[in-house]
């Protein structure tokens, strides 16, 4: 469990509160003298509240919202501007270990994080956007010790990461029965894909 103030911010003006709860249960199975299999499950929940207040309440100020890489939209802020970030991540990892003249470890993991941004307006929060972050990673590590006492280690890893940036178009329904924000349109406005290969000896 982690709770911090002014987390991951670049602009020092907002007041930011952040917490994260992380659970990682794991189990290891031993098969004979040389083989081990491990399983790890990970889940975490995060929440970040950002609030920016103005020292001059008589004049509204412009601020900018980043939407995608290098793309901003301007907005007008009054007494305070608030954003709430709620995220959940689920993933798992499989490990295999061989112990012998050469120690070998093979791992494969996958995780998906979904983070939603909302604007807390009274009791009906308005959706600002969402981010879906998928990560797939495989790695191979081996080491051995020669007769001369020298240890040789090698590690090869590959990671595939895909990020979708989702935006919403919402309209407020002022009917007495609903009085809530209605999503008219939801779509992926930005996509990022990265591949990373790492080799160490």
Where are these regions (language model features)?
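Outer-envelope beta-barrel architecture signal
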Residues: 33-37, 90, 100-106, 146-154
């Amino acid at each position: 469990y982690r709770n911090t103030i002014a987390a991951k911010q670049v602009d020092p003006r907002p007041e930011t509160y952040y917490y994260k709860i992380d659970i990682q249960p794991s189990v290891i199975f031993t098969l004979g003298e040389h083989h081990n299999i491990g399983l790890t499950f990970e889940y975490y929940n995060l929440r970040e509240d950002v609030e920016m207040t103005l020292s001059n309440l008589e004049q509204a100020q412009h601020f900018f919202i980043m939407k995608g890489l290098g793309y901003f939209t301007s907005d007008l802020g009054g007494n305070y501007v608030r954003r709430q970030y709620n995220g959940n991540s689920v993933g798992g990892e499989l490990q295999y270990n061989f112990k012998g003249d050469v120690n070998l470890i093979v791992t494969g993991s996958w995780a998906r994080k979904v983070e939603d941004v909302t604007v807390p307006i009274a009791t009906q929060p308005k959706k600002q956007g969402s981010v879906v972050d998928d990560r797939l990673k495989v790695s191979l590590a081996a080491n051995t010790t020669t007769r001369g006492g020298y240890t040789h280690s090698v590690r090869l890893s590959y990671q595939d990461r895909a990020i979708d940036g989702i935006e919403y178009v919402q309209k407020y329904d002022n009917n007495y029965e609903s009085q809530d924000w209605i999503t008219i349109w939801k779509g992926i406005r930005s996509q990022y894909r990265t591949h990373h290969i790492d080799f160490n000896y």
